[in-house]
From Swiss-Prot:
S-adenosyl-L-methionine is among the record's keywords: yes
Protein name, as recorded: Dual-specificity RNA methyltransferase RlmN
Cofactor: [4Fe-4S] cluster
Pfam families with a match to the protein in the record: Radical_SAM, RlmN_N
PROSITE patterns membership: RADICAL_SAM
Annotated residues for binding of S-adenosyl-L-methionine: 168-169, 200, 222-224, 301
Naturally occurring in which organism (per UniProt): Aliivibrio fischeri (strain ATCC 700601 / ES114) (Vibrio fischeri)
Function: Specifically methylates position 2 of adenine 2503 in 23S rRNA and position 2 of adenine 37 in tRNAs. m2A2503 modification seems to play a crucial role in the proofreading step occurring at the peptidyl transferase center and thus would serve to optimize ribosomal fidelity.
Length: 372
């Protein structure tokens, strides 16, 4: 019987040091050396780690591996966006590279599929399979950095920002999200500024409260409606944690955070004649009066079978101007990669639905929201 090798990408620095000490009988600085090779140099071959002695390299080759998801398909948009289908086990998740001037953002997935069933999101329609491991989260960044490195002749910018806005709800995968974020921020990891790593949540209050005081990164919240009645219609998670509970948790987090500079980014997808009336804008402005926020409006990105439409430019403009009358900073997200279905809300991947979703829908029952 062959013993499975330990994937070193599953460890943050603390975990890697413990593994080296307890399982390999090595000192902490050896773990630090290997971590630097993995993340600073994108190395997955122990023999190339030339400041590691041969005995340890042989031990590592026997017991360990450095294995990231691999690219099963790549699609290139006319605007420079790249969508990679990355193989995790027997399925794919989608990772999106978005260049924009002097920055390049990587949109990273946290789950295979999603359990939350937001009505306007194509990922939610695919069902939920499982949480991604630490190695499968940071491995998306590792693999993307290597892919970009192979294309240096094209002048593509290295990754400067990471947003946890791909497939899945990050805060329903807290066990693996926290160490993955630690690796992103670690000087021996990807060494990203905490202001350049963003976690987006649809309202998992228990997870956000776990993050408070534990990990400091930029926070974005998927709000998408100004009232509980409307939000529950398009985001079933609101039946578990309503808007007041969600925003109270947000205020607790930003009060303990330096990365957010005292305010949160509110994401609001605009659905034609659903949540984009002027009354909705005024309700949203009133709702956020006690929660320091900048508002990012996202015109709906259509996908096959969706019942929703993108609002007209005039409706989008009126909504934005109404919010600005209340002195909010308001931006409209530029649609990127929509020609390859890589825009916000369009990520699907290759998901085998292992929830009870299909059966439940056939029986007309309510679908429970999974909690941490």
């Amino acid at each position: 019987m062959t013993t499975a090798k330990i994937n070193l990408l599953d460890f943050d620095r603390k975990g890697l040091r413990a593994f080296f000490s307890e399982e390999l009988g090595e000192k902490a600085f050896r773990a630090d050396q290997v971590m630097k090779w993995m993340y600073h140099f994108g190395c997955d071959d122990f023999d190339q780690m030339n400041n590691i002695n041969k005995k340890l390299r042989e031990k590592l080759k026997h017991k360990c591996e450095i294995r990231a998801p691999y690219v099963s398909e790549a699609q290139h948009s006319s605007d420079g966006t790249i969508k990679w289908a990355m193989k995790v086990g027997d399925q794919d998740v989608e990772t999106v590279y978005i260049p924009d001037g002097d920055r390049a953002t990587l949109c990273v997935s946290s789950q295979v599929g999603c359990a939350l069933e937001c009505k306007f999101c194509s990922t939610a329609q695919q069902g939920f399979n499982r949480n991604l491991k630490v190695s499968e989260i940071v491995g998306q960044i590792w693999r993307a950095a290597r892919e970009i490195g192979l294309e240096k002749e094209t002048g593509r910018r290295p990754i400067t920002n990471v947003v946890m806005m791909g497939m899945g709800e990050p805060l329903l995968n807290m066990k693996n999200l926290i160490p993955a974020l630690e690796i992103m921020l670690d000087d021996l990891g990807f060494a990203l500024s905490k202001r350049r790593v963003t976690v987006s949540t649809s309202g998992v209050v228990s997870g956000l409260d776990q993050m408070t005081g534990k990990i400091d990164v930029a926070l974005a919240i998927s709000l998408h409606a100004p009232t509980d009645e409307l939000r529950s219609q398009i985001m079933p998670i609101n039946d578990r944690w309503d808007i007041d509970a969600f925003l109270a948790s947000v205020r607790r987090y930003i009060a303990s955070s330096n990365a957010n500079r005292g305010r949160v980014t509110v994401e609001y997808v605009l659905l034609d004649h659903v949540n984009d009336d002027m009354d909705h804008a005024r309700q949203l402005a009133e709702l956020l009066k006690d929660t320091p926020a900048k508002i990012n409006l996202i015109p709906f990105n259509p996908y096959p079978g969706s019942p929703y439409k993108k609002p007209s430019n005039s409706r989008i403009d009126r909504f934005m101007k109404t919010l600005m009358e209340y002195d909010y900073t308001v931006t409209i997200r530029k649609t990127r990669g929509d020609d390859i279905d890589a825009a916000c809300g369009q990520l699907v991947g290759d998901v085998i639905d292992r929830t009870k979703r299909t059966k439940v829908k056939q029986q007309g029952e309510a679908i429970p929201v999974k909690t941490v």
